[in-house]
Curated annotation (Swiss-Prot):
Protein name per UniProt: tRNA-2-methylthio-N(6)-dimethylallyladenosine synthase
Reactions that this protein is recorded to catalyse: N(6)-dimethylallyladenosine(37) in tRNA + (sulfur carrier)-SH + AH2 + 2 S-adenosyl-L-methionine = 2-methylsulfanyl-N(6)-dimethylallyladenosine(37) in tRNA + (sulfur carrier)-H + 5'-deoxyadenosine + L-methionine + A + S-adenosyl-L-homocysteine + 2 H(+)
Gene3D superfamilies: Methylthiotransferase, N-terminal domain (3.40.50.12160), tm_1862 like domain (3.80.30.20)
Annotated organism of origin: Gloeobacter violaceus (strain ATCC 29082 / PCC 7421)
Keywords: 4Fe-4S, Cytoplasm, Iron, Iron-sulfur, Metal-binding, S-adenosyl-L-methionine, Transferase, tRNA processing
GN (gene name): miaB
Amino acid sequence: MESTTNPQGKTACLVTFGCQMNKADSERMAGALTHLGYRIVDESDTADLVLFNTCTIRDNAEQKVYSYLGQQARRKQRDPHITLVLAGCVAQQEGEKLLRRVPELDLVMGPQHVNRLSDLLERVAEGEQVVATEPIEILEDITKPRRDSAVTAWANIIYGCNEGCTYCIVPSVRGREQSRTPEAIKAEICELGASGYKEVTLLGQNIDAYGRDIGTNLASLLRFIHNAPGIERLRFATSHPRYFSDELIATCAELPKVCEHFHIPFQSGDNEVLRRMARGYTHEKYRAIIEKIRAILPDAAISADLIVGFPGETEAQFENSLRLVDELEFDALNTAAYSPRPGTPAARWPGQLDDEVKQDRLQRTNRLVAQKAFERSQRYLGRTEQVLVEETNPRDRSQVVGRTRTNRLVFFAGELAKLRGQLVDVQITAARAFSLTGTAS
């Protein structure tokens, strides 16, 4: 096909749905396309190649993908030279069925094939309609990602998931856990430091399960990469309570580059719901982890995920989740109404709740979350916080925005050209639920 045999001067648009893992995958695919000669653009309606990197965690995200894809399919009917690619978790889940649903697609590829994009496009160029969803050993990164930020970067350290949560489709679409070697990870992070990046977030579906397949663990990796030149801050996400060990907590407290922010989903505050979710811990175990973190790192920020309206969840069980939110006082909480995913055990269970019930519980939860986050934010007032400047405030061009070590957004007056990538001491003068305002010291 013309758009892939000679991509020089042609344009490509990547539309990304879902989690940080997907965003990191899109950066790598954008790097591959740039290496091939494509110019990355934001406008999908005029691009020569359009790639959708998809999410299947919830039904509304999946339906949004099909809506966008339908628009591009109609466009391709008018202009056959366009190349259409569907990547990510929807591609992995649906596979060849997508070609029957959207015959205009040129390439369907699962998350494990991200680093093979260039090779797969060569097959498309030869006239083949390609489906790449078979399980493979994930190739080590061979193409430099085209990163969206010049200050902060993501680095995947473990792919896949070995858990069996009854509501979750991720293990079947991202495969079994595959850890990258510590040496490969450190090489990538050292390269980021040499390129001027200041902060790296290590990524994995269950990041604290890192190394189980290669005889190491996340605490050891953090110690191994900690001295990477140029890198000022390290973060990691997303953690599973089952693997958040005392050793990991102690290591985070010991290493000055590791930020005091931990994202540890709990999903429910009721033990019976947790059992049916197959999460592998109790709410008491979860509370103990948070207590240990705050005992060693009193100012640590904790964020989490919560699902309301799981099949069979009673009002009393939901109130147990509210009680946990109230008592643990999270700095941020991602909330979602349960969405049945085809192929998961919970989707087939009786006791599916009405949407009205789920939405009512979601709204009640979100009101409490905002209240608690606002209360937590007040501790910053009058303090001086070190802020890593990332970009201009899109709502006020006279301000820049960055993040504290605890991942709070901070807005203050300044010029991005002078401050981007700098660590600036900012005195906090106003505190909202999820952001702060201050004055540079």
